[in-house]
């Protein structure tokens, strides 16, 4: 895994330089008109909320450095799922592992520390129990019996997550023929996904089948399940060139659109090959063909994996320097996240870090004390919380009886070892208060905070000649404050966990669709959209501050 983060070569500007000096002011005596007149629907806050999650790594797609026991009777080289399938007693070994690796105990513990999402890595062969034809023409064709029980466990996991108020990101970790050279892509053979048209077609079928199976399963539940937030089309793809992957991505999205049963498909998550700038520019330009819903769009999310322990440069850098680089707002890391978040947000999408850890080379550690790792974790969290729609730590745990505790990689070990915070996100101390008294209190807070923010905004821009519509700032502030409160009060599955807007740029873009003052006739953002956007973000942050003070 080559985890290299390159900065952008160009700056994505919020707006063009104004050519005229026109100003639209608001009377402080007249409350601004909000554009977001309806509260967020349940489907909205589930997909757009901040996802703070953990990968359930080595549950279905197995990795020997995480869990050794299932590999002990595998065929040589005993490093991949296919090797296990070829070995002795594979069916019994795998089903025992699936039934014991993540249990009610783990679900309860994850919820107790504020985790509200899980990412589940799957191989296409794990779907064969519901669609036997998915194995046709693939390496796993002879092993239907071994894997036929996986799909039932996967759907049980979706139900278990829902009971704890958690969303699920489904990740195609292993595609037919392997999309990268690592053994966690299903086999120990060389990667041959992108070089073989047959495998590319089988990969499209896998996405179609996965989408259909997920949607029909969720719709079959009473009430229907809404906690599938996204389908990640490929994990860490390593194409020979970008063109072949980008064409496949567009074709795969078309399969999602056709296969999803119902009106609202989940978000599309795209691995960006550690070429964040390039894939941001491309996905923004191609947003219409990448969005999961052909009529009204939806979320398109780039997935960046950030590790600092694999390259020679990383292993020769101290953890203190890694931490400083993350916190430096002028560094390539922060700038890249900011520019990607803002550019994709304007299109209707965002960025996440779906794999990260505090795994470090021994050469990077100085004191070998928990605090230096904790500082590194805190720095990462600060960046991801600021710019990303979500994050998922890699991974829940390692096989302790074999490998012992590992605070660098095992999430449970990291929390218990003080390397990761004991809880993340807002945790409610009081229940939802919909009384008239609370509405009046909240209205007073909004009015006071909005006026102060508006005065500062107007004063700052009064020094710079240009065309402005400050009324939009006030309207945005109002919408941001009210919408974030709607997210706070929208969660009902977990009495302590609190939802909040995660993909802010994308959510603002959704709220602006069809509003003449904010959107041009061709669907692009209007001249003064940036003022609404700035106001919305400030209002949302003010709501978070107020909610934390009053309810947490």
What does each of the following model-derived ranges do?
Residues 31-32, 178-332, 339-362, 386-389, ...:
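Active-site region of glycoside hydrolase catalytic domains
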Residues 36, 97-118, 128, 134-174, ...:
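An active-site-proximal structural segment forming one wall of the substrate-binding cleft
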Residues 38-48, 103-113, 157-162, 286-293, ...:
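Short amphipathic alpha-helices and their capping/turn segments at secondary-structure boundaries
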Residues 345-432:
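Substrate-binding cleft of secreted/luminal carbohydrate-active enzymes
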Residues 402-405, 409-552:
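C-terminal functional modules
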Residues 2-116, 500, 504, 509, ...:
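N-terminal carbohydrate-binding accessory modules
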Residues 64-79, 132-144, 177-195, 408, ...:
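Aromatic- and acidic-residue-enriched segments that line the glycan-binding/catalytic groove
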Residues 121-125, 173-180, 394-400:
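Short, solvent-exposed turn/loop segments enriched in Gly/Ser/Thr/Pro and often Arg
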């Amino acid at each position: 895994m080559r985890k290299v983060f390159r900065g952008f070569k160009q700056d994505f500007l919020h707006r063009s330089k104004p050519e005229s000096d026109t100003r639209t002011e608001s009377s402080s005596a007249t409350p601004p008109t909000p554009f977001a007149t309806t509260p967020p629907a349940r489907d909205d806050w589930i997909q757009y909320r901040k996802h703070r999650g953990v990968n359930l790594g080595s549950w279905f797609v197995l990795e020997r450095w995480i869990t050794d026991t299932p590999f002990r009777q595998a065929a040589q080289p005993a490093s991949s799922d296919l090797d296990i399938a070829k070995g002795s007693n594979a069916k019994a070994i795998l089903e025992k592992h699936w039934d014991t690796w993540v249990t009610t105990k783990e679900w309860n513990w994850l919820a107790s520390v504020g985790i509200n999402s899980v990412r589940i890595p799957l191989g296409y062969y794990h779907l064969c129990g519901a669609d036997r034809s998915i194995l046709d023409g693939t390496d796993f064709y002879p092993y239907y019996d071994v894997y036929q029980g996986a799909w039932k466990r996967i759907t049980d996991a979706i139900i278990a997550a829902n009971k704890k108020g958690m969303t699920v990101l489904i990740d195609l970790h292993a595609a037919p023929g392997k999309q990268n050279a690592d053994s966690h892509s299903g086999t120990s053979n060389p990667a041959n996904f992108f070089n073989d048209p047959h495998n590319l077609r089988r990969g499209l079928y896998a996405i179609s089948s996965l989408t259909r199976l997920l949607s029909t399963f969720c719709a079959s539940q009473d009430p229907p399940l809404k906690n599938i937030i996204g389908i990640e089309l490929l994990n860490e793809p390593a194409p020979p060139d970008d063109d072949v992957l980008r064409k496949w991505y567009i074709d795969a999205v078309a399969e999602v659109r056709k296969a999803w049963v119902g009106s609202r498909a989940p978000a599309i998550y795209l691995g960006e090959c550690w070429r964040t700038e390039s894939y941001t520019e491309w996905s923004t330009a191609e947003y219409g063909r990448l969005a999961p819903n052909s009529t009204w769009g939806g979320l398109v999310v780039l997935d960046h994996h950030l590790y600092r322990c694999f390259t020679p440069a990383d292993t020769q850098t101290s953890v203190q320097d890694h931490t400083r680089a993350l916190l430096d707002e002028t560094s390539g890391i922060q700038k890249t996240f900011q520019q990607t978040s803002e550019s994709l947000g304007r299109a209707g999408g965002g960025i996440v870090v779906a794999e990260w850890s505090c795994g470090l080379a021994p050469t990077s550690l100085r004191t070998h004390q928990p605090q230096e790792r904790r500082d590194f974790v805190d720095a990462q969290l600060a960046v991801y919380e600021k710019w990303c729609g979500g994050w998922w730590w890699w991974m829940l745990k390692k096989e302790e009886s074999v490998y012992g505790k590992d605070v660098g990689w095992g999430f449970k070990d990291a929390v218990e070892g003080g390397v990761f915070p004991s809880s993340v996100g807002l945790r409610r101390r009081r229940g939802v208060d919909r009384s008239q008294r609370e509405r009046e209190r909240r209205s007073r807070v909004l009015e006071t905070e909005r006026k102060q923010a508006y005065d500062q905004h107007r004063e700052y821009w009064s020094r710079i000649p240009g065309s402005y519509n400050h009324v939009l700032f006030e309207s945005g502030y109002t919408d941001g404050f009210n919408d974030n409160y709607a997210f706070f009060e929208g969660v009902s599955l977990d009495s302590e966990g609190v939802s909040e807007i995660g993909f802010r740029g994308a959510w603002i873009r959704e709220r602006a669709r069809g509003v003449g003052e904010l959107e041009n006739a061709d669907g692009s953002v209007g001249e003064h959209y940036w003022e609404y956007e700035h106001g919305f973000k400030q209002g949302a942050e003010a709501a978070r501050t107020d909610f934390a003070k009053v309810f947490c």
